[in-house]
Amino acid sequence: MSKQYEFHTHVCADDRAQVVVCGGGTAGTVAAIAAAREGMNVLIIEPFGCLGGSATNSLVTPLMTVGIPGNPMNSSISDEINRRSIEDGFAYQGGINPGYFDPSMMPFLLEQMAQESGVRIRYYTTPIHVIKENDKITALIVQDKAGLHAVEGEIFIDCTGDGDLSVLAGANYTKGNPKTGKNQPISLRYVLDDVDLKAFAGTVSDNSITSDGYSSCVKLHGDREVEKIMTRAMEAGDLTKEDLSYWQVFPLERAGRKGGLACNCPEFFEHVDGTDPAHLTETQILGKIAIRRHLAFYKKYFKGFENAHISNVSAMVGIRESREIETEQIMTFADAAVYRKFDDGIAQTNYPIDVHGMGDEYTCKTVKAEAVNEKPYYEIPYGSLVVKGVDNLLVAGRCIGCEFLVQASIRIQPTCRATGEAAGIAASMAIKNGVLPREINGCAVRARMIENGAVFAEG
């Protein structure tokens, strides 16, 4: 048995905000901006040194599409980010997956928008404990280089991605595939620069690499020419079987990064618990070994990589799924399968149920509605953001209240941004009206989102 220690200390409250957002990532940045634009005093607590989360620290580009005609942004702030990214010259709409952007440039814009809106940011700070009175959070104990501090607030929003704040506050959660107990695979993405993308595409003749340098995910023993090249490399010992289990690249040249190639790999299928520091450490170490192996493979088997070099490696491991927090309403696969709509739906999507895995574990399918003439998308209700058992806590992003298979569909950036905007607006409504988040009418949240410029498909 490990030796146990007791630790007691007095901590001074050195900060306070009406709305405290834990995690300045995909959902958290939007949640904070939304609340600030509603007149709230807002503080973001973020353990890294920039905003954006997976989009920046994990290099996740492009945004992907919600799968609804017109790709409506249920978040006006998300739409603004996309528009301003294009105006700033580091993004473009087009190609097979809309929403390409340079992840190295995104932090500049997100910080600018947060500051324009009056959001305060506290970087390099991590919540480690929650102070509660009955079922209400009164303060967070946070740690930074200067020590321990207390941060007080009225409404708290968990945008940590893994539901860290909710767990600290005592909320229940589920985790992983109920059939296997495993979380979705995790990745360590990287970006190459100075790739001759046309020469790269010219290596194959079957368009398995498009003319601008895009390749959809590679599967082991596939019939496309790029897969045959990779199989030969594996047989020669230049790649491993795991390298072929998932490989995908996205061009960044039209996003203002000449010769840029974003790589959605390597992907790991074991030790995939995003809440286990040993798993995260192993992925960082093994991932870097794999990335160097990938670069050597490109230079040996493809044209266009003569001058290519690694310019970015994810500072944060790419987590697809970890915890799903118990909320007042849980989105089920049955809801998605019948394209269920809710009066208080704060986000809409028809992104596929996208579960990564090896062999038969891999699932990527669009749900099919059973109802005749149903609009081809489902909605996320406001109740999926209201943490059960904690009076003044909302959750947004990929860890909202939903089943594992639904989480595989809602985890993309446009949907996470929409949940963040809804949470920020709901927090401001709760404070202005002196009520708890669970007492807020989700229909009013949706109406306010639309009033602010969010676009919802009619259904």
Walk through the language-model features, giving the residues of each.
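Flavin (FAD/FMN)-binding glycine-rich loop and adjacent Rossmann-like elements that form
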Residues: 2, 10, 54, 81, ...
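Short, hydrophobic/aromatic-rich segments at coil-to-beta transitions
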Residues: 134-140
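Glycine-rich Rossmann-fold phosphate-binding loop(s) that bind the pyrophosphate
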Residues: 23-26
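Extreme N-terminal leader/targeting segments of oxidoreductases
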Residues: 1-19
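Residues forming the Rossmann-fold NAD(P)(H) cofactor-binding site
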Residues: 29
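Conserved N-terminal/central alpha/beta ligand/cofactor-binding core
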Residues: 8, 16, 34, 40-41, ...
